[in-house]
Regions:
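Short acidic, hydrophobic short linear motifs in intrinsically disordered regions
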Residues: 24-39
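A short, conserved structural fragment
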Residues: 57-67
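Short amphipathic alpha-helical interaction segments
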Residues: 41-58
Length: 92
């Protein structure tokens, strides 16, 4: 079942997905794989997911690796990331 998220909820869902995988610092995850997995749950398409990943990287929540093909969470902002997820991700 696909759910339609607004921009803030989608960003929180991306952060939550990467956090559940335990990808902090140099332990990174491929963006394409993440877009495919989230595409099964999120009604928004993969391009929107990739756009939100770039936005989160500009804000410092995410670190891009390997010529922007992989991503991990910024360990320096761990508390802010956890608060952002709790504040913006609705229980579904």
């Amino acid at each position: 079942m696909r759910i339609e998220y607004d921009d803030v909820e989608l960003r929180a869902e991306i952060l939550n997905f990467i956090m559940r995988k335990g990808r902090w610092g140099e332990h990174y995850f491929p963006i394409d794989t993440m877009a495919n997995w989230l595409g099964q749950v999120v009604k928004n398409n993969g391009k929107n997911i990739r756009k939100k990943v770039k936005d989160l990287a500009k804000e410092g929540f995410l670190i891009l690796h390997k010529v922007n093909t992989t991503v991990s969470l910024n360990p320096r902002l761990k508390r802010e990331i956890e608060e952002y997820i709790q504040r913006n991700l609705k229980d579904r």
